[in-house]
Amino acid sequence: MANHSRPHICQCLTRLASVKRNAVVTVYGNRKRTGREFVDGVLSLAAGLIRLGLRNGDVVSIAAFNSDLFLEWLLAVALVGGVVAPLNYRWSLKEAKMAMLLVEPVLLVTDETCVSWCIDVQNGDIPSLKWRVLMESTSTDFANELNQFLTTEMLKQRTLVPSLATYAWASDDAVVICFTSGTTGRPKGVTISHLAFITQSLAKIAIAGYGEDDVYLHTSPLVHIGGLSSAMAMLMVGACHVLLPKFDAKTALQVMEQNHITCFITVPAMMADLIRVNRTTKNGAENRGVRKILNGGGSLSSELLKEAVNIFPCARILSAYGMTEACSSLTFMTLHDPTQESFKVTYPLLNQPKQGTCVGKPAPHIELMVKLDEDSSRVGKILTRGPHTMLRYWGHQVAQENVETSESRSNEAWLDTGDIGAFDEFGNLWLIGRSNGRIKTGGENVYPEEVEAVLVEHPGIVSAVVIGVIDTRLGEMVVACVRLQEKWIWSDVENRKGSFQLSSETLKHHCRTQNLTGFKIPKRFVRWEKQFPLTTTGKVKRDEVRRQVLSHFQIMTSSL
């Protein structure tokens, strides 16, 4: 008999089937489903998977855009004790095969956007693969090939719907394998438990204030931990899910009005797109229906925050810092609260007004520790432990990598986030940079994120990437690549008073006025014309930026 004191992500279904029985809980295009209809769909699919032969611990890979059926598959696989491994639809077939060879799925589910993967994966390419399923088909483009695949509806047919009391678990309580983006090298499969998902979802519910009356717009892909964790929080409170296949700023703004959206999550690039499109298509019109916005994946600049408040004046805007290995958010910070007229983010601390980026306080259940560097009294590695952390990287028996042991509790492991930071006297965590991304210049350590945070405070800069390049005198030289705001121009001649001009000297002066230490100020600046190269989860590919900069410089010589 199943032990129902154990956490399971499908425990949310009982609430949906009762409290939200006749209320709409999912909207996908013209398709709307009530709580009862959604739960019946999950249970029918789960029964079909059992009849097919899916067993506890079997891995199911899903490659698809966001949809109500994606949520249905996530919960149905979990219900029968399977493990879901979402594949990024932006990957090439080669990358998808690499991921599948790692996690060894028995079943591959795709929608029409990734159906070619089902077709192109030949027998023997993925030895573990037994079944291929098309999530939903409205096209005849692949009619001949699709005859060999199962469909969601086929699996639901002629099955006895199981009871909600028939949860199953994988042997180690694993439920999802999320792939890290990996700015270099191959992505790793982060294995996440039922407990981690529920713990982190409860944190979002408590801190963001999500409730059953919320209407949530899915802006983040369900292949990423941010999208999955927030989706789980909404399932638990019984909110209504409005799903777009993928993010598009113009469509998102339209859907916000049409469906009376109250909350969504974002990253700085998404918010910038929403602001730009709102300015050009809606003349900066307000949306007073949105009440909660959770930003992740990087800090919002003061300019972006100001513009966001103008568009969403009634929204409480929060920022979160987290990582895939911690099942999403570790800390939260309120950036704007419309209920407090004089609300303003303040930055007390570290004997300097701004050192790095403040990311707020840990969630109530989160343990964070800064393991101090030998040569520092306050800065060090950021470590975490608790029920939110990953079980392991898939293929490893335990979470051997990124793990440190506390000197005070030698039998309890801490997860190394890979970030460098410090706590202030109020308990706020400040990010200084990545431990593996620091620049060693003239014997001093420089963390790119700290310099970037200063640069984007200039009104003429929309984004910045700081890298280190080989220098004959300094070892590494600090170089900043900057993207300019609209109407600003780059000129290394003396600025005309009142003009929207930027130059290396004006940016160096800006850094000095922001109290950035001299050796951290970039020695050279590169104006970046296009978008910075990003991973599929929106992280900057610093190695690629460095390659392009070196190509631009051609031959590096000492700048001093």
Swiss-Prot record:
It is found in: Plastid, Chloroplast membrane; Peroxisome membrane. Its main location: plastid. Keywords: ATP-binding, Chloroplast, Ligase, Membrane, Nucleotide-binding, Peroxisome, Plastid, Transit peptide, Transmembrane, Transmembrane helix. GO terms for biological process: phylloquinone biosynthetic process. Signal peptide: none annotated. Involved in the biosynthesis of phylloquinone (vitamin K1). Converts 2-succinylbenzoate (OSB) to 2-succinylbenzoyl-CoA (OSB-CoA). This is 2-succinylbenzoate--CoA ligase, chloroplastic/peroxisomal. One of its GO terms (cellular component) is chloroplast membrane. A motif (Microbody targeting signal) lies at residues 558-560. It is a multi-pass membrane protein. It comes from the Eukaryota. SUPFAM superfamilies: Acetyl-CoA synthetase-like (SSF56801). The chain crosses the membrane at residues 69-89, 189-209, 225-245. Its EC number is 6.2.1.26. It is an enzyme of class 6 (ligase). It catalyses: 2-succinylbenzoate + ATP + CoA = 2-succinylbenzoyl-CoA + AMP + diphosphate. Disruption phenotype: Lack of phylloquinone and seedling lethal. High expression in young leaves and flowers. Not expressed in roots. InterPro entries: AMP-bd_C, AMP-bd_C_sf, AMP-binding_CS, AMP-dep_synth/lig_dom, ANL_N_sf. Belongs to the ATP-dependent AMP-binding enzyme family. MenE subfamily.
